[in-house]
């Protein structure tokens, strides 16, 4: 499938690249930028709002590009974290079994991409729940450019955290 490129190029320090039309920039311009492919954004929202009463999660796949002046995170793919039936009452978790399945799917469907963060979708995010998600992020996705994308299906709010 041919990928249509924008005619305008973004120049960042010494990093010059053409952005495909199917990417959208998230957040305010600054030294760190997040770009997400429309496919990935649409897939996350379809998962989140298909059963908005359920807690769901997955990993974000892509790449990080750096220059002297800025860092850009490109999200190109998503893999859902499928929690086994007997563990669904625990809510969102990332244990060894779940990671094994995620890495098997990455190898099969996205072998050229790396884990660049994760998403969580749930109805309502209390302060206590947010602290749990933040700890989950630090335990499983620590690193300079790893992002957390939270979808509050009750309030229909979506936020990226770097």
Please tell me what each predicted stretch does.
Residues 1-117, 123-162:
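N-terminal beta-strand/alpha-helix entry module and adjacent surface
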């Amino acid at each position: 499938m041919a990928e249509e490129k924008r005619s305008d190029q973004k120049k960042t320090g010494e990093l010059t690249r053409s952005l495909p039309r199917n990417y959208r920039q998230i957040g305010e311009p600054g030294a760190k930028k997040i770009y997400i492919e429309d496919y990935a954004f649409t897939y996350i929202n379809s998962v989140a709002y298909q059963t908005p009463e359920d807690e769901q999660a997955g990993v974000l796949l892509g790449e990080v590009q750096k220059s002297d002046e800025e860092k850009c995170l490109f999200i190109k793919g998503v893999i859902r974290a499928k929690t086994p039936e007997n563990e669904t009452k625990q809510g969102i978790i990332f244990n060894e079994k779940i990671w094994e399945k995620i890495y098997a799917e990455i190898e099969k469907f996205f072998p050229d991409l790396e884990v660049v963060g994760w998403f969580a979708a749930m109805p309502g995010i209390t302060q206590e729940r947010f602290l749990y998600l933040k700890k989950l992020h630090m335990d499983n996705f620590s690193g300079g450019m790893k992002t957390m994308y939270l979808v509050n299906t009750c309030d229909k709010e979506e936020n990226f955290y770097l």
